[in-house]
Every structure is written in structure tokens, then in C-alpha cells.
Amino acid sequence: MTFEKYFDHIIEYPILFAIRDNYIEPNGQSFKDFILGNFTNLKDKANLKDFETHLATIFTEVRLKQYIEVRSLDACDWQCLCDGPAFFTGLFYNALDEAYEIVMKWKKENVMNAYLEAPKKGLETELEGKKLYEWGAIFLELATKGLSNRNQINSKGNDETVYLKHVQNVVKNKKNRAQLLLEQY
């Protein structure tokens, strides 16, 4: 998706509310209506704060704010709190081109099918001829390499790859948290 398509999606998305002195209901209007001054319950046009509020009400996997917010890891347990940010840091700062070369070949419908299948099949879900744990290993290797290249050393002499231990275990065991919980019962 290009930035232009993302922006079009965002402004066409129905606005949930606006805030002035109190909450103002939009009656199903889009943010584009608000930008154009066609917001029936408010005479003002939208401002930057309104746009930031609107963005906070859209729950896509990735959101563009003043930073890129990756939301897919917003419900993990204690062990993975550092893994997600470390994983994406390794990819975004040092291996983004390599990761892009992989995913650019994927078909959108196959990704969406895997997205819908994963809650049922876990890491056994197939995507483009590989199981998700296999893709996990590939991207984990890229993230690990990226973090190693950053060479950010802590007071104990370790680089940021120490924060990937939980993800390494998930990929190695080929089971996510839900699968492990199901095995207990």
C-alpha cells in the first residue's frame, strides 16, 4: 500500500467523534467530510489535533502517527514485551530491504487467508509455500542480523539480540502462546 492509498483510506474512514469543549458525534461522516467543512454537528474544519485523534480510533495492524506504530504485538505476555520492539527494530533499521524483497512476492489474498487461518492453525498455517514458523525463522534471522549490525551494547556486554529469546523459542518449538495454552487443557 502506498502512502497515498493509506491516507485515502484514513480520510474516508468514518470518524467516531470530534472534541471541542465536549465530544461531538459525527452521524457517520468521514474525516474527509470534516476536512471539507461538511461536518454537520460542527462549523469548524478539522485541524491536526483532530487528525491525530482520528488516527487513534483506527485499529489497523500498523498505524502511521508521528511514528510507525506496529500493533500486532499488543497482547503478548511478559516474556515477549521486549521481543516485539527488538524484532521490528532489527528489521526496520538494518534489514528492511531484505524483508521487503521477500514479502513483495506474496499475493495479498494469500496473506489475508493466512491472517484468517492463523487463529485456528497457529504457526502451522501456510503462506506462500511455507509454514508461519518457517517464515518466522527467516525473519528472525534478518532481525537478529539487523540488531547485531546496530551493535548497541548494554552494561553486561550484550547486544540487543538478547531481547529475541522468547521469539527464538516460539520459532524453535513451532508453537505460539495459544497453542501452548491449549496443550495444558
Listing of model-derived features with the role each one plays in the protein:
Residues 1-185:
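C-terminal accessory/tail domains of diverse enzymes
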